[in-house]
Amino acid sequence: KALGGIPVAMSYGDVYTSLQTGIIDGTENNETALTTGKHGEICKVYSTDQHAMIPDVMVMSEKVWKNISPEDQQIILEAARESTEQHKIAWDAAIDQAIEEAKTTMGVEFVNDVDKEAFREATSGMISDYCEQYPGVKKLLDIIDSVE
């Protein structure tokens, strides 16, 4: 709403048909949706605004963690670090492949020169409200903003 649209919640499986029939005019997703979800058959412009990143995390209950030996904790931490690095490599390759396929076989144009500051300004009120509603979010957002 803050960006001038009318958000519509729907299952991912309904997005293609909704785009096809004009129920929705666009979708928010990563580049792979253009190819795996076939959205590039309908959506011919993709704006790369980097408003979201894939923050995959590994979680474990504190109760379980405390019952694991320090040696095994280190093994788990190292495996998590290694899998994170491998995931980054695989994800980057998947994105590159999706972009190439979307451009060459679907005719999708990629717009990379996006006015990100305009998006930040338009959503600043929403972000402020969210920070008030959920204590601690401001600190997390500051950490996210500090990452380049």
List where the protein language model places each region.
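N-terminal secretory/targeting leader peptides
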Residues: 1-148
